A protein has these predicted regions:
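Membrane-interfacial loop-to-helix junctions in multi-pass transporters
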Residues: 72-78, 103-120, 147-157, 201, ...
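Interfacial loop-to-helix junctions that mark the boundaries of transmembrane helices
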Residues: 2-5, 27-41, 69-73, 105-110, ...
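Core transmembrane alpha-helical segments of multi-pass membrane transporters/permeases
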Residues: 39-44, 52, 63-96, 112, ...
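Re-entrant/interfacial helical elements at transmembrane boundaries that shape
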Residues: 134-146, 162, 173-187, 350-364, ...
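Hydrophobic alpha-helical transmembrane segments of multi-pass integral membrane proteins
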Residues: 79-89, 109-142, 321-359, 378
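Juxtamembrane and boundary regions of transmembrane helices in multi-pass small-molecule transporters
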Residues: 163-166, 170-225, 230, 388, ...
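Hydrophobic mid-bilayer segments of alpha-helices in multi-pass membrane transport proteins
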Residues: 8-21, 33-55, 78-84, 116, ...
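Alpha-helical transmembrane segments of multi-pass membrane proteins
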Residues: 81, 112-125, 151-167, 330-343, ...
Length: 436
């Protein structure tokens, strides 16, 4: 493929980036109050442009290709999770589960330990369940509630959970990315875990220290309401079932049913902060509607990225990056660049590793790259990119649960950036020595 055709195939992505930057600058201008002018319009314009430049295909075929990406199986699964997450979050908030859980956290932890405590909780849960999505679903509503109670930055508190969720996504033995990375690079999970830990654990410790320092100035509310332990039960059950390995959709359904049962039961007993049957239905409906914009963004992202793939954009990236490799360090950098660029184009780190896994193995074997380090590079850089793109599943889900724009969360995502820097230094400085 010629440079012209390859760059044209990728141009919708370039346009999207320009629009996101422009809309972000517009939104932070104090003279403009509508901070929601970000991703929906940006993706609509980029999608129309992507369909328009797809020469050589009739318009119907272009639209079919776009629709295929927008309705892909893995994307639709995420959309159902958005629907259930919105339903659960709104049900829990309306019956007082969020407030009760926040009061419990504030009664146990001093205010200065809230930030590092949230990060450690996200790291622990994500390692236990192997999925960043489940971690975001379980903890973001609590983090957002704490932020409101402590008059802290909601975007920052949400970003702590999103960042910590990638600790487990990167290291957990049951994470999809770990499984795919080790299978494509033909190495043991335990060996990959050792190498990967040497690279990212120091970054996690530094981020934890940073959150500890940032938390020193936080003040707890002067008055903390009495904890209603029954209303904490839905979140407790969600955490336990998620850690036990239950499917995330089943977890959310169970959590929503528990919220309804406790809320309606409290109403029948005359307790305040509860709802009747139709109040529960109304809360669920509002939660689902609240996720509507993010669902549209996710579908438009899937459609546009499918157009890019169909036009040869991903093949162009792979060919260009692998054309000039001539050393072990260069091979490792090319593996990192491959998975990063493809992740930007697919918005799915597991798919990105699957796409470039075999070519990365060939590059690694040719230049003597240790399979364990290659797997660590694939996993770490894919998690870094997935954690920073504003149209990724986890970011959109977190934004919906916290009632924010993804751009409100992005500036505070320290951990994904930290592991990216750590992995890059590991390549440049030949660390760990034994595997370099």
């Amino acid at each position: 493929m010629s440079n012209k055709k390859g760059l044209q195939a990728l141009s919708p992505l370039f346009l999207l980036i320009v629009l996101i930057v422009a809309f972000t600058v517009y939104s932070v201008d104090s003279s403009h109050q509508d901070t929601s002018l970000s991703l929906t319009v940006a993706f609509m314009i980029s999608s129309i442009y992507a369909v328009a430049i797809s020469g050589g295909m009739p318009v119907r075929k272009r639209v079919d290709t776009y629709s295929k990406g927008a309705g892909a199986n893995n994307l639709m699964l995420m959309l159902w999770i958005y629907v259930l997450a919105g339903s659960f979050a709104a049900s829990a908030k309306a019956m007082g589960a969020v407030d009760a859980t926040v009061n419990l956290a504030l009664s146990i932890l001093p205010a200065s330990m809230i930030l590092p405590g949230l990060f450690l909780a996200a790291c622990f849960i994500s390692v236990s369940i192997g999925t960043s999505v489940g971690t975001v679903v379980a903890l973001v509503p609590i983090a957002a509630g704490l932020a409101h109670s402590m008059d802290a930055n909601v975007g920052m508190m949400t970003a702590i959970i999103v960042g910590g969720a990638y600790f487990g996504d990167n290291l957990s033995f049951i994470s999809d990315t770990t499984v795919v990375a080790t299978q494509t690079q033909n190495c043991k999970m335990s060996d990959k875990f050792k190498v990967n830990s040497m690279i990212v654990v120091p970054a996690a410790v530094l981020v934890l220290i940073a959150y500890s320092v940032m938390g020193v100035g936080l003040q707890a509310p002067t008055h903390i309401n009495e904890v209603e332990y029954m209303k904490v039960l839905p979140y407790l059950i969600v955490l336990i079932t998620a850690i036990a390995g239950m499917n995330v959709m089943a977890v959310l359904t169970l959590g929503t049913l528990l919220c309804g049962a406790i809320g309606i039961g409290s109403h029948l007993l005359g307790a305040s902060g509860s709802y009747d049957l139709f109040g529960w239905f109304s809360a669920m409906g509002n939660g689902i509607i609240g996720m509507g914009e993010l669902i549209i963004i996710a579908m438009m992202a899937g459609g546009m990225l499918e157009i890019i793939r169909e036009n040869g954009g991903i093949d162009f990236i792979i060919n260009k990056i692998t054309a000039h490799v001539n050393s072990k360090r260069g091979a490792e950098l090319s593996i990192a660049a491959l998975v990063s660029m493809v992740n930007i184009c697919t918005a799915n780190n597991t798919v990105a590793i699957l796409t470039v896994g075999n070519i990365s193995k060939k590059i690694g074997d040719r230049f003597g790259v240790d399979n364990r380090k290659a797997a660590s590079i694939l996993d770490t850089f894919s998690c870094m990119v997935q954690g920073l793109i504003p149209y990724g599943v986890q970011m959109l889900l977190a934004a919906g649960l916290a009632n924010l724009s993804p751009m409100d969360i992005l500036p505070y995502l320290y951990y994904p950036l930290a592991i990216g820097v750590a992995a890059l230094l590991a390549i440049l400085l030949r660390y760990p020595k034994r595997y370099s």
